Every structure is written in structure tokens, then in C-alpha cells.
Curated annotation (Swiss-Prot):
This is Orotidine 5'-phosphate decarboxylase. Keywords: Decarboxylase, Lyase, Pyrimidine biosynthesis. GO terms for molecular function: orotidine-5'-phosphate decarboxylase activity. Catalyzes the decarboxylation of orotidine 5'-monophosphate (OMP) to uridine 5'-monophosphate (UMP). Its EC number is 4.1.1.23. Belongs to the OMP decarboxylase family. Type 1 subfamily. InterPro entries: Aldolase_TIM (IPR013785), OMPdecase (IPR014732), OMPdecase_AS (IPR018089), OMPdecase_bac (IPR047596), OMPdeCOase_dom (IPR001754), RibuloseP-bd_barrel (IPR011060). Pathway: Pyrimidine metabolism; UMP biosynthesis via de novo pathway; UMP from orotate: step 2/2. It comes from Tolumonas auensis (strain DSM 9187 / NBRC 110442 / TA 4).
Length: 232
């Protein structure tokens, strides 16, 4: 059986709602993403609860601090048994290299370490506001290249950026793509650069982060398995 390409974002207000969803799916259907809101509310115990259920967990906390602090946070993530953890590439080479070094003692059991380049909600005007008068993709490519040079496993990127990043950085460099929608004609939230699951995989994405289209569906497992079938 092929590994799940879908990472479901558990963006629920209450832990009980998240666990109710989790009880409807299996680790062979998807992986799970825990973001800042749920982690801040429910902490490491919630992550460990999901790991004990057999799920691969992507801890999406986007660490961005001085190298020593980020290294310690990444190590703590590995201790929880997560499958993937991320940092902000804009923290720089030294920070990313420190994070990578912190995982060396874990060997094959180390989580994948990826970096966030440009948030998918950001457009050129947003970059200009913070002093970067360049197109978003130019900054994405710059940070993704730096991430690879620092020895990380991949980056988060929009699906529109995936094909160029794959050709520039190679097949082994993992691309994790949010902004996935089952119907791109409906723009209902804060992801500006969106694409369908099939198109994103064709573009070069390795893993797809999908939230509301699955978690808010009347029958989440049916939707999830339909997506998986389309990607088979």
C-alpha cells in the first residue's frame, strides 16, 4: 500500500471535536497536522495521544528564534515522536543547521525537518510591506535553496511553485503543499494560492495539507478516500 499523501489539518476549536474526527479515519487514510492553536490549548499530551493511535503527526509550529532555542524545540518535538516538524527558513542558515544537528542523535527515527518559505496567504504587496520588493516566488526559491543547503528535508510551498522547485532542487527534496481545495472556484478563506489535489501532485508536491474540505465534510472519510483514489 502506498503511503498517505494527504495530511489533514486538525484545526478544531475543541479537542473533543478533533478526536471525533480522528476516530472516523485510520493512519492508512491520512497523516495529521497539529498547528499553533490546538498545540497551545492542549500541548504535547495531545500530540502523543495521536501518535499512540498510530498516526504520523506533522507538528506545524514554524519555529523561528535564535539557533539554540530552535534546536531545543526541534529536539523536544522529536521526543514526542512526531513524523514531521517545521521551522521558518527566514530564521537563516545557522538556525536551520542547528535544528538539523539537534536531530542527528535520532538517526532513522528523526522526524522530517522542513522549512516554511513564504506563507501562502502572502502576496507581492505583503512582501513589499516588510521590505522585500520582489515577487513571492523569487523569495520562495531563495529560501528553499537555502533550506536545502542547510541540510533540511524539504519546504512548505504553494502548489503553483512546486514544479519549478522540484526541477531546481530535485526529487529527494520534499514539497509539502497547503492551499489544497477540492473546488478552486470557491475562495472562502485565507489561502490565496490554491490548487486541487490531483493538480498539486502532478505539479510536484509530495504531501498535501487539506483542512476544511475534509474536516467540515458531512462524511469526512468518504471525502478523504475519494481524494486518495484520485491520487492512486
Amino acid at each position: 500500500m502506498t503511503e498517505p499523501k494527504v495530511i489533514v489539518a486538525l484545526d478544531f476549536a475543541k479537542k473533543e471535536e478533533a478526536l471525533s474526527f480522528v476516530d472516523q479515519v485510520t493512519p492508512s487514510d491520512c497523516r495529521l497536522k497539529i498547528g499553533k492553536e490546538m498545540f497551545t490549548y492542549y500541548g504535547p499530551q495531545f500530540v502523543e495521544q495521536l501518535v499512540k493511535k498510530g498516526f504520523d503527526v506533522f507538528l506545524d509550529l514554524k519555529f523561528h528564534d535564535i539557533p539554540t532555542t530552535v534546536a531545543k524545540a526541534v529536539k523536544a518535538s522529536a521526543e514526542m515522536g512526531v513524523w514531521m516538524v517545521n521551522v521558518h527558513a527566514s530564521g537563516g542558515r545557522k538556525m536551520m543547521e542547528a535544528a538539523r544537528s539537534a536531530l542527528l542523535p535520532y538517526g532513522d527515527k528523526a522526524p522530517l525537518l522542513i522549512a516554511v518559505t513564504v506563507l501562502t496567504s502572502m502576496e507581492q504587496s505583503d512582501l513589499a510591506d516588510i521590505g522585500l520588493d520582489i515577487p513571492p516566488f523569487e523569495q520562495v526559491l531563495r529560501l528553499a535553496t537555502l533550506t536545502q543547503q542547510a541540510g533540511l528535508d524539504g519546504v512548505v510551498c504553494s502548489a503553483q511553485e512546486a514544479s519549478v522547485l522540484k526541477s531546481r532542487l530535485g526529487n529527494e527534496f520534499k514539497l509539502i503543499t497547503p492551499g489544497i481545495r477540492l473546488d478552486v472556484s470557491t475562495k472562502v478563506d485565507d489561502q490565496s494560492r490554491v490548487m486541487t489535489p490531483v493538480d498539486a501532485i502532478k505539479a510536484g508536491a509530495d504531501y498535501l495539507v487539506i483542512g476544511r474540505p475534509v474536516t467540515q465534510a458531512a462524511h469526512p472519510l468518504d471525502v478523504l478516500r475519494k481524494i486518495n483514489l484520485s491520487l492512486a
